[in-house]
From Swiss-Prot:
It comes from Geotalea daltonii (strain DSM 22248 / JCM 15807 / FRC-32). It catalyses: orotidine 5'-phosphate + H(+) = UMP + CO2. This is Orotidine 5'-phosphate decarboxylase. The lineage of its organism: Bacteria, Pseudomonadati, Thermodesulfobacteriota, Desulfuromonadia, Geobacterales. InterPro entries: Aldolase_TIM, OMPdecase, OMPdecase_AS, OMPdecase_bac, OMPdeCOase_dom, RibuloseP-bd_barrel. Keywords: Decarboxylase, Lyase, Pyrimidine biosynthesis. Belongs to the OMP decarboxylase family. Type 1 subfamily. The active site is at K66. Catalyzes the decarboxylation of orotidine 5'-monophosphate (OMP) to uridine 5'-monophosphate (UMP).
Amino acid sequence: MTRDEARAKIIFALDVNEFSDVEKWADLLSPHVGMFKVGKQLYTACGPAVVRMIQKYGGEVFLDLKYHDIPNTVAMASLEAARMGVKLFNLHALGGYEMMAKTVETLDKEFKGEERGKVLAVTILTSSNEQTLQEVGINLPVPEMVVKLAALAKKAGIDGVVASPQEVPLIREACGNDFLIVTPGVRPAFAAADDQKRIMTPAEAVKSGADYLVIGRPIAAAPNPAEAAQAIVAEIVAG
């Protein structure tokens, strides 16, 4: 794998809430990462303009808002996300088949085969474990529930999933290779696990078949964030 291919796999999590911080990170890291993740805090604080800010610096955007509502509401929100030109955006697989299928149908009707952002389904959050699932009445092991949701998403026409790297081989087996897998819960060896329970190193995650890796604090909190991103790229290349 080349350095450019490895770099393209890295999604930097913009865990900030100010335009000035977004501009700083977009300027600093655009040469070193493949995409920027805009989550709920940043989008609520700054709105769609933050997407345009990143695009101005040549950056691609993963709009991580995890839509979960009635089918029509999610479909219309997803349509607006796609119209903004983001590369990836997502919804919750727990919203069910109808919600996901309606979203895909709406996007297909609008774009008519033209290139659009890929829609991903969130399976089980990486902060969750068996106890978390049991608390909401789900009595399946995490890996089994993840695969069940991933298969449902593929059946509905969704482009891929967001899932823990540990579940990547199971998802590949159930859904095939033409299905995107984005993995948070990725931490290089020099970083602490923070609040995510199911984690893996970047090299391990890519080796297991992940297409994109969401990485935030290990880059942002490093003394030299650009060098940290470069070190992660080197780790992926080395395998």
